[in-house]
């Protein structure tokens, strides 16, 4: 068995991919090696961009790619042309990131016609993502009919939330008839980093109380107890929760009809306002990018500094509430683009949490060590590089091929 597995994230105009070798062909033993990774951008345009990286070598070309099918065909040809594989038959499994599994999917699943139909039906909950995810599945099933296909849902990890954590206090029929509830997102990332952290701590994940902070242009916090998601900050949509790059996060809902009536905005315009014009961008007036706002704050821009403090304060408030819900905390995780790379963001968030045992070591934080808490601190603070693609590949092994997977530590 070749053991090559592809992880796919299909977007409306993009296709992100990684190819892994998950089994040693000589010994049959489990191992994890990235063979290549890449991204197709501007699908549907005459100047689409195809990026492929194999080890330290990178190729980039501009060409017309009309749709996802053409993109997939070009990608698979490139794998052979650049000697990544000798034959498409070597790819034994494909894992697809799917945005929304609703209440139907509490785990990754082997894709059947019935599963694919349900993914498309759940497009009512994720109209921008599920339909294109489903299209990507169909395209790769045609291109690689021999390969097992597995759907990995962003929402699945959070299906362990209790009713008191996922219900909104609205009339019951809105949950029963329309499925309005907290679903949460970034589940694959939170699941991966919590497993890595537990492995590095040398303790079983089931014994730990963890708060995971996935901080990027989209940000979410997750309370993890006994290895399961107990609560998460994103809700019915990824708009909910903490302040983000361009999203407001949680606000008083009555603000929205007030703005509608005062400024005569439509529902579409209001949705654009809270999703695309708010957050760091809205408060700073500069950028949605944390690095740009941070630089402006360093140069004396008061609104930029305020945006950073508001960002940290909203996150601290959620961390505190989750510690209460978990009955304590053993580890605080930072992941995502901001969480992994911004030492100042980590410092600002942890600064007011020392009374909870969250005591940051400044030198370790500056050096981006894995554990950055003070030596005597009761709570571990970890920087964990997320790897959703690897988690997807592992789920293909587990779900489709019924093979055991390595501890998460293998890639950290």
Swiss-Prot record:
Matching PROSITE patterns, A to Z?
A: ACETATE_KINASE_1, ACETATE_KINASE_2
Q: What is its EC number?
A: 2.7.2.15
Signal sequence bounds: none
Which GO terms fall under molecular function for this chain's record? acetate kinase activity; ATP binding; propionate kinase activity
Q: Which SUPFAM superfamilies match?
A: Actin-like ATPase domain
> Manganese: present as a keyword of the record?
no
Which CDD domains does the record match to this protein?
ASKHA_NBD_AcK_PK
List the catalytic activities from the record: propanoate + ATP = propanoyl phosphate + ADP
Give the EC class as a word: transferase
Whether Transferase counts among this entry's keywords is yes
* Localization in the cell: Cytoplasm
Instruction: Write the record's keywords in alphabetical order, separated by commas.
Output: ATP-binding, Cytoplasm, Kinase, Nucleotide-binding, Transferase
Superkingdom of this entry's organism?
A: Bacteria
Its predominant location is cytoplasm
In terms of Pfam families, this protein maps to: Acetate_kinase (PF00871)
Q: In which pathway does it act?
A: Polyol metabolism; 1,2-propanediol degradation
GO terms for biological process, alphabetical: acetate metabolic process; propanediol catabolic process; propionate catabolic process
**Cellular component per GO?**
cytoplasm
Which PANTHER family does this one have?
ACETATE KINASE, ACETATE KINASE-RELATED
Provide the function of this protein: Works with phosphate acetyltransferase (pta) to capture exogenous propionate and regenerate propionyl-CoA during degradation of 1,2-propanediol (1,2-PD).
Q: Which family does it belong to?
A: Belongs to the acetokinase family. PduW subfamily.
By what name is this protein known? Answer: Propionate kinase
Which organism does this sequence originate in?
A: Yersinia enterocolitica serotype O:8 / biotype 1B (strain NCTC 13174 / 8081)
What gene is this protein a product of?
A: pduW
